[in-house]
Curated annotation (Swiss-Prot):
Source lineage: Bacteria, Bacillati, Cyanobacteriota, Cyanophyceae, Synechococcales
Gene responsible for this protein: psbN
Source organism, top-level taxon: Bacteria
Its membrane topology: Single-pass membrane protein
InterPro entries on file: PSII_PsbN (IPR003398)
Family, as annotated: Belongs to the PsbN family.
Purpose: May play a role in photosystem I and II biogenesis.
UniProt entry keywords in alphabetical sequence: Membrane, Thylakoid, Transmembrane, Transmembrane helix
Name the record gives this protein: Protein PsbN
Amino acid sequence: MQTLSSAPDPAVSVAVTILAVLLALTGFGLWTAFGPKAAKLTDPWDDHDD
């Protein structure tokens, strides 16, 4: 039985790290897409002349 003072399993640490990175990237993407600076973003399809 593990207690709170014992070291966690390395697989759990890796999984938590990967989850944290994915959540950070998702948050950054949402902030970029819908945050205050989103009004300055342009759509390349609209800028392209046919």
